[in-house]
Amino acid sequence: MTQKSTIVYTHTDEAPALATQSLLPIVQAFARHADIDVKTADISLSGRILAAFPEYLTEAQRVPDALAELGELVKQPGANVIKLPNISASVPQLTAAIKELQSKGFAVPDYPADPQTDEEKAVRERYDRIKGSAVNPVLREGNSDRRAPKAVKNFAKKNPHSMGAWAKDSKTHVATMQSGDFFHNEQSVTVPDATSVSIVFTDKQGNKKELREPVALKAGEIIDAAVMSKKALLAFLAEQVKDAKAKGVLFSLHMKATMMKVSDPIIFGHAVKVFFAPVFEKFGGKLAAAGVNVNNGFGNLIANLDKLDADTRAAVEAEITAVYAANPDLAMVDSDKGITNLHVPSDVIVDASMPAMIRNSGRMWDKNGKAQDTKAVIPDSSYAGVYQATIDFCREHGAFDPTTMGTVPNVGLMAQAAEEYGSHNKTFEIEADGQVQVIDAAGNVLMQHDVEAGGIWRMCQTKDAPVKDWVQLAVNRARLSNTPAVFWLDENRPHDKSLLAKVKAYLAELDTNGLDIRVLAPEEAAKFSLGRLKNGEDTISVTGNVLRDYLTDLFPILELGTSAKMLSIVPLMNGGGMFETGAGGSAPKHVQQFLEENHLRWDSLGEFLALAVSFEHLAQKTGNAKAQVLADTLDAATEKLLLNDKSPKRKAGELDNRGSHFYLTLYWAQELAAQDKDAELKVAFAPLAAALTADEAKIVEELSAVQGKAVDIGGYYAANPEKAAQAMHPSATFNQALNAL
């Protein structure tokens, strides 16, 4: 017997959490036959809330801090983790989850919107650690290797998704700041030796204040600082509202308020206040007194209207109606329900919203549900040009053809909270005019900015070891796939210049003989890669953390119709492996449909792909030959599932997530029964393959019979496990066959 190995499968949120109820027992049953124990770790939003407040709970209600435990595990050489998408909670999502837990008898405290006492401040601090992208930075102890697997790419070529045609006279464009933003104010320094730096604000009267405790830096670490001017931002936003009206296009704002949980909600709030300026000019005081905070979106104002007296409320509503009439039309998230692009910060996430718009002829939906040309407002100009270059390319050359286009895999710098995505704990809304300085332990001023009240100042860190690992990964991928690799770096940008010095030094240490490796500024890199993509050629994008995020949505959505079908591997720096299931989110709309119609359209293809590479990694690390057989047969089963079109469909009564899990089980069992590499597995799975083959029609009928009516799983953020499991296993015949295994 080989020694038992462990794979950790994360329990997360929304659609992937429901899918886990169905898929995980199948995976555990198969893995058991290869001496592999598949355990779960609960890193869901509700699980993380409960773990943060043990002293508020009874002994029986307490849960371990699974995220902290996983954060330690990923530093071990034997780590093997399958990571599903989780919620990056905005304040509205966080408060909804808290309310749900409280209604179930968990006495967790309320989220203090305006903490006054020390206790409230301590509670708020704990909740703020759960907010935003709180999971990925803890687990991502490696860089990112994301690509479309051959089977998926071939399927997309044979079964192309819809692509909206582009008109040569499309008025769609990106609007971004030309000065006063983070990009134009960036400074960057590489520290030669380990030190710590203080971030000190000095006001006009000379009063000094440390904005946080000192930040420890390692030798060779790159630090950057930048500031966005509030004055410049407000002027820019007002200009764009006017310009959208003049051009007759929709106004839309594209931010990432979930991940960039300090800076982007502030920017979002300014956009709401500028768009609805007359409302705030006339009623700002009364709205503030009613608890309105539009950093949580315009929806927050609507939700608090009932706190106003009847006359004020009527006046505010009339003013809102007048603004809608006078201003450009807003892009809509849900035109039927009147939900605009400015209602909820977590509804429009730039990396998903921009590719969706580009795929839809460069259009978003107006209040009547009609597609219209759009002004896409992306205030900070660091990466906005990549989207403008893509729009220009489509306007000139027309839409891409999924049947002939190439692919753009990504190697992303991500480890140890690199760059902007690690900046939240070093991001501050400045309270008064003055200066912010970054000062090292010896008292040297490394960077300094003049700042104004309301400006957003931030510092980022990029450690040396992750950069070295990233360059190595890029060279490995270029060689293994025999594909040109482009570093998307702008030598005129301070941070990129610092990074480039390291990239050149580390490339010189590696064998790059015969490889095509180049460095291009992001817009040029985009044009180069888009040109090759249209010609059916492949190009690896080698990028920093933000572009990793943006491009692994942009290119897959154009190539495959979704980013959930990506292979997303995180080779951990200490030798373990983390396998992320796709590059998409947790699909709240899928859950909404499931609760209303008992039809879950979530596609678990990302999980199937991640499982196969997880088994393969385990086989290579431990010499477990059975794990390799599981990997190979799972890949074959996944390909068969795609070719036979057994992925979930959109409408109730059709095959859904549970049906696709049945077909995966059927094909996987058939492949195991047919293979000759491992006799034990062959014998073990032959009866299951026979039973499922015989009962296929009956099982599919049982799975579709339950659809078309509402289902109760006892919660949203914290569903009742028994009810959810029951809902996700509606076929008695399938359950029986699995149990026999």
Regions flagged by a language model, labelled:
Residues T2-G269, P278-K502, Y506, L510-R658, ...:
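Extended, well-ordered protein cores
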Residues K682-A690:
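Short, charged, amphipathic alpha-helical segments
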Residues A719-L741:
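C-terminal accessory extensions/subdomains outside the catalytic/core fold
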Residues V700-Y717:
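A glycine-biased, small/acidic residue-tolerant capping/turn segment at secondary-structure junctions
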Residues N644, P648-G659, P687, K709-I713, ...:
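Terminal, compositionally biased segments used for targeting/anchoring and flexible tails
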Residues A619-T622, L672-D676, L703-V706:
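Secondary-structure edge/capping motif, primarily at the C-terminal ends of alpha-helices
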